[in-house]
Amino acid sequence: MAKSQSNKIVSLQTFRDLKQKGEKFAALTSYEATLSSMMCDAGIELILVGDSLGMVIQGHDSTVPVSMEDILYHLRCVKSGNKGA
């Protein structure tokens, strides 16, 4: 796994460079600030926020009911817990 530095901002170019070098990196899913903060402290380089929150958080049978407003809300939550976002 790539060595991460706490609070270091990474970009798409960072991941392209890691892929080109054959280095691995960690990616996990979060929908809220507390977990995002723990992931940041643990050195997770990529935090995913996706429409799966419809099934995981909202209790829907599919991701279809998830709106862009829902995604943006959870992105703000994750960002508030991640000092490097």
Features from the language model and the residues they span:
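Hydrophobic faces of well-ordered beta-strands that scaffold small-molecule active sites
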Residues: 26-30, 47-49, 84
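Conserved, mostly hydrophobic/aromatic
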Residues: 28, 32, 39, 78
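Glycine-rich, proline-tolerant flexible connector loops at the mouths of alpha/beta enzymes
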Residues: 35-36, 42, 46-72
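Alpha-helix-loop-beta-strand connector modules within alpha/beta enzyme cores
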Residues: 10-12, 60-85
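N-terminal amphipathic alpha-helix/helix-capping segment at the start of soluble metabolic enzymes
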Residues: 1-29
